[in-house]
A protein has these predicted regions:
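Short, functionally important secondary-structure microenvironments
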Residues: 1-69, 75-171
Length: 171
């Protein structure tokens, strides 16, 4: 069952970038209607297959453009093979690194996403390059990352998630 929010994001993205049609129709989707999934959207490997998670309540708060951009962001994780290239890496740092690599290329994302400039890093580098830079920064700062601006409501910065629970440093 697809929700109107997901369907609208799907249609808007396909209108803007039909390239994604093949990926979107082939990927199994898990639509969370009860806000149990701790992120707005994500891709994961489940049972050997890539699955798209969509948190309906969270995404319903975003504009249609932000919803479509979020969907594009998740599809780029798949296209750029971020799910398999990150094996053996620190999960939080790899998430930050892959998000920075993608977010430079996607227009219309929600305001609370991560960009390279937040870590004094240049745009348009690979996820591996960002990962090494973040790892180096964390090692220099006793395991903490220094983010340049506050990221309100980012799922990694919520208590009980993968972050430290404040909006300025990640673990």
């Amino acid at each position: 069952m697809y929700t109107p929010t997901y369907e609208n994001a799907f249609k808007l993205l396909l209108k803007r970038a039909p390239f994604y049609a093949y990926m979107l129709v082939r990927i199994p989707k898990i639509i969370d209607l009860e806000n149990k999934f701790p992120y707005p959207a994500a891709v994961a490997i489940s049972g050997g297959r890539v699955v798209l998670h969509w948190n309906e309540q969270w995404m319903a708060k975003e504009t249609p453009e932000q919803q479509a951009a979020t969907l594009e962001h998740e599809l780029l994780h798949i296209a750029w093979k971020h799910l398999t290239r990150g094996r053996g890496k620190n999960r939080l740092l790899w998430n930050y690194a892959t998000d920075m690599a993608i977010n430079c290329h996607v227009k219309g994302l929600p305001d609370d996403v991560i960009y390279p400039h937040m870590f004094n890093l240049p745009e348009n580098m690979t996820a591996e390059w960002y990962y090494e830079q973040l790892l180096e920064q964390a090692e220099k700062n006793g395991g903490k990352l220094k983010i340049q601006i506050e990221i309100k409501n980012h799922p990694w910065n919520q208590p009980g998630q993968n972050g430290s629970g404040n909006n300025q440093e990640g673990e």
